Amino acid sequence: MNLRDLVMVAVGGQIAHPLGRAPYRIGYDGVPRMLPATGGIVLNRRIGDRCVGLAGDHIEPGVALHNNSREVVGPRDGPNTALITYACVGNLARVITGPGTGKTGMVTGKHGGVNHVLVDFRPEVLRRLRIGDRIQIESCGLGLGLLDHPEITALNASPDLLLRWRLAERDGILHAPVTHLVPAAIMGSGLGKNTAWRGDYDIQLADPDIRRRYRLGSLRFGDMVAIVQADNRFGPTYRQGWVTVGVIVHGDSTASGHGPGVTPLLSGPMQRLRPVHAPHANLAVIFGLRALPPARSYRPLAGRPATGFGRVPRPTSTRRLARAGGL
C-alpha cells in the first residue's frame, strides 16, 4: 500500500435523528407496515448481529451520522458530501460533545440515499450518547492504492482494515476472506450512480431459491461479502469476469429492489482478486470488537404471514351481517 502518501483529515458530523416520511411502507409482498428505519442511535443491534428478518427497514446498527452544516461556498450539502466521501471503513471516530466525550468507536460503513456514515460503539457508550452529539472521524483511505496489485481498486477502506483483514497473496492473486458470495444479478437499489465512494447498494432477498442457494438469510452486519460479476471502480456495474468485495452496512428492507446494503471495498478482475470462504470474516472479528454470534438463517420480514397489520379482512355482505344480528 502507498501508506506514506496518504493524508489523514479530521471530518465530523452529528448523530442524526430518525426521519419520518409516509406512515406506511408497502412491501414487495403487497403488505403495508409501520417500522423503525434509518437514523438515530440503535441500542440493541450492532456489528456482528443478524441483519435479516428484523422488525425494521434499512436499520443502521450503532450510530448514524450526518453533517447538516452549511458552507458559504459550494453546494448546500457540501459538508455532508465530504463526510460520506472522506470517512472510510475502519477509521477511528471520537465523541467530542455530550456525556460520551472522549469515547471512541469505529466507522463501519456508508449508507447512500440518506447519506449517513455509520459508527460502532460499545453498548455502554451507546447509552450515553445523545441525538445531535458531535463525532469527529480521523479519515484516512482516500487515495489508497495497492502498489503490488494495480489492477485492484480500493474504495471506502482504511489502511487499518486492509492490514487486519488477513488478505493473502498467492501466485499474484489477492485472496480476500468473505462470508458469502452474492450474484450481481440480484443487486438492486444504488445502481445507476457514477461513484461507489459515497454509499452502498442493496442485495435483493425476495427470491427464496436464490436466498437459500447463497445462504443470504444468514447475513450479519459487518460481514465481508463478494459480489460476483460486479465492477465498482466508477460506480456499480455488471461486468463479467470481475468481482467486488464489500461489507454489509445496513439491514434488510421490505421495499421492492431493496435489501441489506453493501459498501464496496475492493474491486478487480477475478484473475487478480479472488474471494475465499471464511465464516468469521466480519468487522467484529477483524477488529476484535466483540465475540461473533453464531450465524443462523432468517426469513425476510416481507413474505411472512402478516401479524397484526396489513392483512385486509374478507368483506362481509349486508345479508350475512343481518343474519348475524348486526343490522
Which positions does each model-derived feature cover?
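Epigenetic methyl-mark regulator signature
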Residues: 1-2
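Long, low-complexity, intrinsically disordered segments
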Residues: 309-327
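Conserved mixed alpha/beta catalytic, RNA-binding, or beta-rich assembly cores of soluble enzyme
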Residues: 7-303
